[in-house]
């Protein structure tokens, strides 16, 4: 199947947005810089760099799955591949980070709140502990993958069902999905922030599914419509009188189309750089928050203005690259071993 180059571009861009935001926001949490000075670097009254990155990534996840599942879709192979690709790196990092925290604190009670029922470890096995914690339920979360991973795993679990209904009737499927989206959007009654809501993230996922299955390519002329929308959201001096959730969706779709229109240009290059970053993006995403959370507060004594901040970012990015590479290497070895073991068992 032909590789869609702008998928790589979007994946790299999304994770850069998310990591950049976390790098900056940790400066505030560590008392290095007031949030008022940082906010203009990643947000305004109409957009937020991290929420844009997350929204586009949910679209990208749906698009990638539906695009690769156009032909010879196997339910068992799908779940096996998703499980190995997502949960193996999560398990490895969770174990290593837990042992690291245990070595530091000398007690499990200093890592997790007391009184958590033992059965809730199942949320960790599913990779959904941080997402469940976001809803006020105590779990054994170490914040690896944050709420993002659990929400995405839920959508991966129901993807075959969504795909079935999408193929049955594209228009009816989209109308129902849009109806649910608008109902949730304009009658919002959830405790979680709107940009983290499962139904709104699910709608972005569905938009991506439909793009990946039916319309993965766009006429380059569409950029003359989409790019002005993106620029307007970034530069608009006043708050648009519409729902925050709607702003996120409109901007994410416009940003997607703008990137998609670059496909003819991207096809002319070899794409190795984007492809490499894209291949390691998930592992870097898993490790990045741990690195930022651990390194930034300890760098305070060495901060010397902007030069110190840039040096800190450089060190953290380098550590992300190294640890992300190691995590992927170890994960790939484990996945290969498990796949070989399964193949041997099937031959018996």
Predicted regions span which residues?
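Interfacial loop-to-helix transition and helix-capping segments at the boundaries
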Residues: 5, 41-54, 136-151, 187-207, ...
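Membrane-interface helix-loop-helix regions
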Residues: 37-45, 85-151, 184, 250-259
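Membrane-proximal cytoplasmic C-terminal regulatory module of class A 7TM GPCRs
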Residues: 331-348
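Transmembrane alpha-helical segments and their boundary/interface "anchor" motifs
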Residues: 14, 47-56, 68-107, 111-127, ...
């Amino acid at each position: 199947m032909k590789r869609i180059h702008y998928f790589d571009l979007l994946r790299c861009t999304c994770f850069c947005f998310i990591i950049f935001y976390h790098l900056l926001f940790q400066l505030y949490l560590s008392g290095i810089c007031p949030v008022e000075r940082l906010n203009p670097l990643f947000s305004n009254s109409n957009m937020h760099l991290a929420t844009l990155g997350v929204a586009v990534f949910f679209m990208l996840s749906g698009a990638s799955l539906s695009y690769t599942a156009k032909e010879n879709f196997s339910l068992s192979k799908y779940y096996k591949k998703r499980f190995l690709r997502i949960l193996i790196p999560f398990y490895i990092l969770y174990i290593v980070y837990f042992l690291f925290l245990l070595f530091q604190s000398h007690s499990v009670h200093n890592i997790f709140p007391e009184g958590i029922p033992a059965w809730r470890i199942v949320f960790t096995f599913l990779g959904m502990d941080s997402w469940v914690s976001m809803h006020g339920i105590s779990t054994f979360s170490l914040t690896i993958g944050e709420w993002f991973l659990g929400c995405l795993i839920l959508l991966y679990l129901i993807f075959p069902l969504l795909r079935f209904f999408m193929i049955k009737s594209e228009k009816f499927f989209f109308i129902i999905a849009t109806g649910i989206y608008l109902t949730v959007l304009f009658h919002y009654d959830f405790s979680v922030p709107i940009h983290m809501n499962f139904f709104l993230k699910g709608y972005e996922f569905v938009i991506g599914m439909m793009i990946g299955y039916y319309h993965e390519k766009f006429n380059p002329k569409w950029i003359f419509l989409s790019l002005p929308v993106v620029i307007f959201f970034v530069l608009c001096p006043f708050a648009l009188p519409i729902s925050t959730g709607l702003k996120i969706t409109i901007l994410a779709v416009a940003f997607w189309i703008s990137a998609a229109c670059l496909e003819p240009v991207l096809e002319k290059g070899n794409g190795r750089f984007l492809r490499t970053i894209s291949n390691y993006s998930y592992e870097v995403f898993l490790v990045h928050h741990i690195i930022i959370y651990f390194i930034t507060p300890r760098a305070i004594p060495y901060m010397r203005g902007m030069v110190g901040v840039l040096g800190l970012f450089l060190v953290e990015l380098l550590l992300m690259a190294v640890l992300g590479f190691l995590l992927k290497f170890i994960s790939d070895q484990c996945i290969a071993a498990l796949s070989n073991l399964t193949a041997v068992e099937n031959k018996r």
